[in-house]
């Protein structure tokens, strides 16, 4: 697997990063509003945004003292988010259908 693909997969592996990407899928946002909307403290959100930026999934625009983030390559990121959402829904469905350990035997 290429370094690019590995980096993107690694960046998408953390739930907070996926949540940040979902928040950015509707509009550009500064780190303060992103962290508040995703329930993260600002340093944690900044750390995750740096990882997403390093993977090429988000871009940043400096506006005075504010850093405004947006999706980079929306045509790629949006379908990835849709696929991840479907996988998460499938996981929840499978967890709900799994027999409890007491009944499984």
Where are the regions that the model predicts?
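Short, hydrophobic-biased segments on the C-terminal half of alpha helices
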Residues: 49-50
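N-terminal helix-turn-helix DNA-binding core of bacterial DNA-binding proteins
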Residues: 3-43, 63-76, 105
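Amphipathic alpha-helical dimerization/coiled-coil segments
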Residues: 1-4, 22, 72-105
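Alpha-helical residues within the helix-turn-helix
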Residues: 36, 53-54
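Residue-level detector of secondary-structure transition/capping positions
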Residues: 28-29, 53, 84
